[in-house]
Amino acid sequence: VHAGLGGRAEPCTASRYLCRQHPVEPKDERDLLLRLNIIARRIGRRALLVPLDDAGAVFAAEHSAALAKEFVLSPPTPWTPRSVADKSELHRRCRALGIPTAESHFPDIPEEADAVLGRLGFPCVAKWARPWLLPSGQRSTMLVTGRAQAHRLLAGTAGPAGPLILQRYIAPGAGDWFFHGYFDDGGRCLFGGAGRKHVSYPAHTGHTVAGEWVCNPELEAHAHAVAARLGIRGVVDMDFRRDGENGDYALLDCNPRLGAQFRLFSDRGGLDLARVVHLAASGRAVPEPRPAYGRTIVVEQQYLQSSLRSPDALAHVRRFRDAHEFAWYAPDDLAPFVALGRRAASKAIGRAVRSSSALAQRARAAKTSGGN
């Protein structure tokens, strides 16, 4: 396994399964193509290219002709990834194709935003259409609880990540759900599973930090139908929320790539989506899936942060203790988990030092002021 990553050392680079890390910090798309070709030559043979974020999936699909000379690619058509990764385009396609989704609006000016907020009420959801173009560290989705907050966000709607989308908030009482699957060239699902999101981070609008593989034939059939209407090929990660008002599974997000929690869906034979991608791309048969319903996954550090804010801490402890899969901890590959711990400790020490320094400065300032 080779990884093309940014300049900062990531905990995953410590993995015993990683052959080599290749720094990738391109100036533009042309530069990225050049760097990927250099990586291909270093590897020495055609390797399977597996994007792990929306930007990579869109780039790989739209430059498939150039990349296919050096890499083996999954089957997405060039237009599909952008049309589902772009949340504004996804919403328009859902409306046109009759796919249930949350009511969404695209205000341009504060007056339009106020009218939308009057219709949707509070809280509502604000999200950026093209989150892969956001500055590092900026949240792509958040709950809006007041007009002033919406107006501040609206100021950035003309930026590359825009437009800003204001969306009806569907309460999670009927369940937060997701579906991961792989669809072949003919649109047939070779492997897939429905997951229940038990804990998200940030709460209500964030990604899965505690999830479970569940038997939900209704959602699986719905996800297959959604994929067929959208023309999905290859791997996909879809987020749904069941609407308590009408019982629909509303599609909230569609990522044309491996989902971060794909290892949740490791079946009783050890088959997961990464292996399915490799088998399909190499022309080999994909075995019949053997679902492992009840299998759970936890993202350690963010789950613990969420647990500290929960009134039911004991239930969180039990879920953590009984998890089958973790984002970082693996008994056969401990180095990434250790590296993550070191990074967390370093950040904590840095915060403590800065806090102590700030307190000392305030104390000196108060002493000087008192002396005068």
Where are these regions (language model features)?
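ATP-binding N-terminal substructure of ATP-dependent carboxylate-amine bond-forming enzymes
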Residues: 1-76, 111-114, 342-372
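Active-site nucleotide/adenylate-binding loops and adjacent lid/helix of ATP-dependent enzymes
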Residues: 81-165, 170, 185-188, 217, ...
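Flexible, glycine/charged-enriched surface loops at secondary-structure junctions
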Residues: 165, 233-237, 287-293
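Glycine-rich phosphate/pyrophosphate-binding beta-alpha loops
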Residues: 198-202, 206-210, 255-270
